[in-house]
Regions:
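Alpha-helical transmembrane segments of multi-pass membrane transport proteins
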Residues: 1-321
Length: 321
């Protein structure tokens, strides 16, 4: 933890600490050098796993949709639909983050995108900085829970579990957490009206045709893509890799229909995807090495003993966690 607070890349921290304590364990006779060099076989297992191909495809899908300005259009659409609700822009950001979490599956991408496109308009509209930043920071982290979360893909490979089953199990808690965020924003806006801008009465009204047109352009494309990707995974119709391929192809199709599929945007999307994928995979490699040394040195047994002897019960463990 001390090294993590130095802002050094977490992947390097985990791998470095694992190697350091692995060498200490070898010198003290906890495990042999043969067991120590099992690092290489574990890393090769990651690289040789065909299911992991879904990770770069999901990353590219999210980056390509961001370059096609899908996120910007979706946020503007939600702001229009929620313009008469107290704290409507903050709620729009939360809904937008939920949808984009289901597109990218990465926290970092959602945080960066939402900060760039949502924070300036919220501050300009009169939202308190703590509410604006808190909304973005909290809702952007839904990408770690809502499928297709990249973490869940890796977790399914580490555990003997089906990816579709794990996605289905994580979907409802993620949506519930998003709903709780919306309830909190509504309650906070009612209790502290100074934290949100006052509702302005507008003389212009929108007809049903205009509202439908806005929804079709801003909401329908990303929701349809999410439904296609997630539906194919949860029903077991295709594998996770095939579903990710469909998502990447769908992102390219949406970009083409909006006139954003240019050579420059494609190059930028591939470059950003490669940078993010490298970071993600090295983080996973470091975490794999760290967990291996942690188990060999008896870390799992120590935690289980602490939990068993704590006497706080299952609800107490839940509160502590």
């Amino acid at each position: 933890m001390l090294v993590v607070f130095t802002s050094y890349p977490i992947g390097f921290v985990l791998a470095g600490v694992a190697i350091l304590f692995g060498l200490i364990g070898s010198l003290t006779g906890v495990f042999s050098l043969v067991e120590f060099f099992l690092f290489t076989s574990r890393i090769w297992f990651i690289a040789d796993n065909l299911q992991i191909i879904a990770v770069p495809l999901f990353v590219f899908m999210g980056v390509m949709l961001e370059r096609a300005e899908i996120a910007k259009d979706l946020l503007e659409t939600l702001q229009i639909l929620l313009r008469r609700v107290p704290g409507g822009m903050a709620m729009a950001v939360t809904v937008m983050s939920t949808v984009f979490a289901a597109i990218t599956g990465i926290i970092g991408a959602t945080v960066v995108i939402m900060t760039l496109i949502a924070l300036p308009p919220m501050l300009k509209a009169g939202y308190r900085p703590e509410l604006a930043l808190g909304t973005i920071a909290a809702s952007s982290t839904l990408g770690i829970l809502i499928p297709p979360s990249i973490l869940l893909v890796f977790l399914a490979e580490l555990l003997p579990m089906s990816i579709g089953t794990l996605f289905a199990a994580a979907l409802y808690p993620g949506l519930l957490l998003s709903a709780l965020y919306l309830i909190y924003i509504g309650g906070y806006s009612f209790a502290v009206p100074a934290a949100v801008p006052s509702l302005t009465r507008t003389t212009t009204t929108m007809g049903a045709t205009q509202i439908i047109a806005i929804i079709v352009r801003g909401v329908l494309p990303p929701v349809a893509l999410i439904g296609m990707v997630m539906g194919s995974i949860l029903t077991g119709f295709v594998t996770i890799t095939e579903s990710a391929s469909v998502g990447a192809a769908g992102a390219l199709l949406l970009a083409a229909t909006r006139g954003k599929l240019t050579w420059h945007n494609l190059q930028e999307s591939l470059h950003r995807s490669a940078m993010m994928i490298g970071m993600i995979f090295f983080l996973f490699v470091g975490a794999t090495c760290f967990s291996y040394v942690f188990r060999v040195l008896g870390g799992d047994d120590l935690i289980l003993a602490l939990v068993d002897n704590s006497g706080v019960g299952s609800w107490g463990i839940l509160l502590i966690a």
